[in-house]
Amino acid sequence: MKNPTPGKNPFELESYRDKMPMHIRELYDDMTRNYAKLQGRAGLGRFWRFWAFTVCYLALLMVISDTTTDTILVFVGLVLCGWLYIAVPSFTISVRRLHDDGKPVFWAVLPQVAIFYLLAEFTLGLPPNWIVWAILGAMAAVSFGFMSLPGIPLDDAYGEEPRED
């Protein structure tokens, strides 16, 4: 195979960044360059593309962990490490989305708590606690509802209006 970026490491994703489709490049940037960036704003499309990736990533990780491991400890470790890998970028893009709506950052924490509780309960094999699920689910739904609202169409204290393509 010919190296598409001569002089660069062909196994390094950064060397392929310029050749990626725009939406994949934004997702890659959110995972690497904007990993812990809390400033600025994120548009609706960018936010939902990232969350769709997050759900697919966690589901795939759970399936792989379930089919390849025999012990619950390894399964829990793999799923927890996978969630920790994606938790910070998910939180930061949620914060930037809330900046676009002008809402408090508190609402970005709720989906993370709900996902953590769901993963912990599932991986530890605990029986479902429907009251906790209902409370966390309702709070996460309200949070995602806030993040689904259109942003403020003008520049604000967090930056200029995000560009949606």
Predicted regions and their residues:
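Membrane-interface extramembranous regions at the lipid-water interface
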Residues: 2-53, 90-106, 144-165
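Hydrophobic alpha-helical transmembrane segments in multi-pass membrane proteins
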Residues: 45-92, 104-149
